[in-house]
Structures are given as C-alpha cells and as structure tokens.
Amino acid sequence: MKDPRDIIKRPIITENTMNLIGQKKYTFEVDVKANKTEVKDAVEKIFGVKVAKVNIMNYKGKFKRVGRYSGYTNRRRKAIVTLTPDSKEIELFEV
C-alpha cells in the first residue's frame, strides 16, 4: 500500500470548490494510478475524518507546442471527497 501523502497531491481551491464545502465536499488532486478506496483511506488517515463517498475525474493532457517542439502536458486526476454528516470539517479549507 502507498503512503497516503503520495496519493493526495494537493487540495484544489477554486471558487467552485469553495462553494461545495458547505455540502461537506472537498476537492483534491490525486495520483493518476490511485483508486477510490486508496483515496478514501488516505483522506481518513491524513485528516482524521470519516468519508462517505469519493467521485473521481480524469483529465487527459493538453497538446502544447513551443516553436517546432510539441508534446502533451501531464494528465491529471481529481477527486471530490464527500464527508459523513457527523464528521468534523477539514481545517485546510477554512477561510
């Protein structure tokens, strides 16, 4: 099993994700190879909260070109973690 800090890369803090916090939904960028169970265990271990469900979205890399050199940006994976109603808040997202 991977270290939880290798699975959760960083929180995604945007206007849209801040609106979801009222519904106890938190958004993280996660490892591309991580599955829902690994993300759930990592969030519970790092933040000490109870997770109800995990939704995951995959983003493919964009085509970029600089002069005659071309390539793709790295692909990404985003997880929206929903906490149980009796779970405490994650302090990282407090404003």
From Swiss-Prot:
Any GO molecular function: structural constituent of ribosome
Keyword Transport: no
PROSITE patterns: RIBOSOMAL_L23 (PS00050)
Gene Ontology terms: cellular component: ribonucleoprotein complex; ribosome
Entry keywords, A to Z: Ribonucleoprotein, Ribosomal protein, RNA-binding, rRNA-binding
GO BP term, example: translation
Keyword field contains Hydrolase: no
Gene3D superfamilies: 3.30.70.330
UniProt-listed InterPro entries: Nucleotide-bd_a/b_plait_sf, Ribosomal_uL23-like, Ribosomal_uL23/eL15/eS24_sf, Ribosomal_uL23_CS
HAMAP family xref list: Ribosomal_uL23_B (MF_01369_B)
The protein's role, per its UniProt record: One of the early assembly proteins it binds 23S rRNA. One of the proteins that surrounds the polypeptide exit tunnel on the outside of the ribosome. Forms the main docking site for trigger factor binding to the ribosome.
Subunit-structure text: Part of the 50S ribosomal subunit. Contacts protein L29, and trigger factor when it is bound to the ribosome.
Family indicated by similarity: Belongs to the universal ribosomal protein uL23 family.
Protein name: Large ribosomal subunit protein uL23
